[in-house]
A protein has these predicted regions:
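Conserved loop-alpha-helix segment in the C-terminal half of the alpha/beta-hydrolase fold
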Residues: 225-265
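Alpha/beta-hydrolase
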Residues: 159-238
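A short loop-to-beta-strand scaffold at the N-terminal edge of the catalytic core in hydrolase folds
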Residues: 2-5, 9-25
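Conserved HGGG/HGGXW glycine-rich cap/lid loop of the alpha/beta-hydrolase fold
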Residues: 18-71
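Active-site loop/oxyanion-hole signature of alpha/beta-hydrolase fold enzymes
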Residues: 19, 59-101, 279
């Protein structure tokens, strides 16, 4: 693995990790898998998945406002701007083709990357995100937007890190492995008071969320011609969310879309079932290569 500094065209700096082979060595080449984390996370969130993948090289990146990113709360967090960061990253790494995979909020960024740069993106995968967050653009119903922002506002934390691990472990079904903890550790920082808070903080978190609510995914989803796989994580009991069911049905009718519904999967399935997610991404890349060979 090689860590690199990346710069955006609007003057911000962040960090990416390039995984060249199973041993962490080897040339990058001109094609790679790019994994995009969700809101409040950072590039090491993907470590459990990357360590199990067979398809190389793989690039993980601290997206705008996250991890090592220097972007502040007043900067542009539109999905379009975040997607441009990834397109610029690919250019900086001399990548001619990428397979872009996004989890949660990262799914929206992945979708926009695929739509904005069709010549760059060989395939796209949205893991429990990208299509399911309600759109509430600025200028639309202000009450609805305010309600969504209030409902999705994260807790301020400021609690002992051991309490965070306990809460996450309970959310993961009572099991938080050392591997999971290592993947999540850079998400938090310990303040002078000895208490843990997210690195992104509340202000940047809400700025990213505002950008997400401004995004309408369906024009981009309808326009894609490359293979796109969409995973929906579902509870063990029968799915009763009518809005989500309509999203799944609409996604199933998209051209080139393959929908998977993972019963029993938690939203953070890359941590819960990293082998399954690694196999998904490997299969996406392999099938895309087969499709390209048949069409040439």
């Amino acid at each position: 693995m090689v860590n690199v500094v990346v710069a955006s065209s609007d003057g911000h700096v962040s960090a990416a990790s390039v995984h060249g082979s199973n041993s962490g060595q080897g040339p990058l080449g001109d094609e790679a898998v790019v994994l995009l984390h969700g809101l409040s996370q950072q590039r090491r969130f993907w470590d459990p998945v990357v360590s199990r993948m067979r398809q190389w090289p793989v690039v993980t990146v601290d997206q705008r406002g996250h991890g090592a990113s220097t972007a502040v709360a007043s900067d542009d967090y539109s999905i379009d701007r975040c997607a441009r960061d990834i397109i610029e990253l690919a250019a900086d790494l001399n990548l001619a083709r990428i397979h872009v995979v996004g989890h949660s909020w990262g799914g929206a960024v992945a979708l926009r990357v695929a739509a904005a740069a069709p010549g760059l993106v060989a395939s796209a995968c949205l893991i429990d995100g990208g299509l399911t967050t309600p759109s509430a653009p600025s200028g639309s119903d202000p009450d609805r937007r305010a309600e969504l922002l209030a409902r999705l506002r994260p807790p301020a934390l400021g609690i002992p890190i051991d309490d965070i691990w306990r809460i996450i472990g309970e959310g993961m079904g009572g099991s938080l492995t050392l591997e999971m903890r290592d993947a999540l550790a850079p998400t938090y920082e310990i303040g002078a008071d000895g208490l843990a808070r997210t690195v992104i903080g509340i202000d940047r978190h809400m700025a990213v969320l505002e950008g997400l609510l401004d995004y309408e995914p369906w024009p981009d989803a309808d326009s894609l011609l490359v293979p796109r796989w969409a995973v929906f994580c579902e509870p063990r009991h029968a799915q009763a969310d009518e809005v989500r069911l309509r999203v799944i049905e609409r996604t199933q009718h998209l051209p080139t879309a393959l929908v998977q519904r993972w019963n029993g999967a938690l939203h953070d399935v890359p941590l819960q079932w990293p082998s399954l997610v690694a196999g998904l991404v490997d299969s996406l890349v392999e099938s895309s290569a087969s499709d390209l060979a048949r069409s040439s």
